[in-house]
Regions:
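C-terminal motif of bacterial Sec signal peptides marking the signal peptidase cleavage site
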Residues: 15-18
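Beta-sheet ligand-binding and adhesion/scaffold domains
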Residues: 49, 64-68, 92-160
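Tryptophan-anchored aromatic micro-motifs
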Residues: 34-51
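Short, solvent-exposed loop/hinge segments that bridge or flank secondary-structure elements
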Residues: 46-64
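N-terminal glycine/threonine-rich, aromatic-flanked beta-hairpin/loop signature
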Residues: 58-86
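Short, low-complexity, disordered segments immediately C-terminal to signal peptides
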Residues: 20-38
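Short, surface-exposed charged micro-motifs
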Residues: 54-56, 82-84, 111-113
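Positively charged n-region of N-terminal signal peptides that target proteins for export
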Residues: 1-6
Length: 160
């Protein structure tokens, strides 16, 4: 009976050890997959009067966009968050999820549209609505890319 107990204990230890090794391999594989998916990394900066907006954008092999955006607007708390979206034609539609002024208990989410012209991104203005907590552009309402504040130029990601 004593030998059976030792055998079960030994078998349990081997099982636990092999599971832990497998988990570390999965973490390494997930990190490799994440690195492989980011096909292109681009950085943009817009300066308007005393406002500065920085974007670091990752494009994966499927054309999906993700990245970070920091908005430093004069006399306003800094908005720091993530963008996720995709191109539809020459227009990039993203959802910007951010915190304001370092207050992490409340998260905001806004839609944004950028028109791509060469190496420049132009942040458009459009009517937005909120329904049941979801904010989106009003359907069939044009987004204005002419009368805008923020025109982003491509910058080196190291100087951002």
């Amino acid at each position: 009976m004593k030998n059976l107990g030792l055998f079960c204990l030994l078998l349990s230890c081997i099982g636990i050890t092999s599971c832990k090794n497998n988990q570390s391999e999965k973490v390494e594989e997930a990190a490799e997959i994440e690195v492989e998916q980011a096909m292109d990394v681009s950085c943009y900066r817009a300066i308007y009067e005393q406002d500065t907006v920085d974007i670091k954008m990752n494009t994966d092999k499927n054309g999906e966009i993700s990245g970070d955006m920091v908005m430093k607007v004069m006399d306003m708390p800094i908005k720091d968050g993530e963008i996720v979206g995709e191109y539809r034609g020459d227009t990039l539609f993203v959802s910007y999820t951010f915190v304001q002024g370092g207050y992490t208990k409340k998260t905001y989410k806004n839609p944004m549209a950028f028109l791509k012209k060469g190496d420049q991104l132009i942040l458009g203005n459009g009517k937005i609505e909120t329904t049941m907590g979801a904010t989106y552009f009003v359907k069939d309402s044009p987004i204005d890319f002419e009368k805008v504040k923020y025109k982003f130029s491509k910058v080196d990601c190291d100087t951002k």
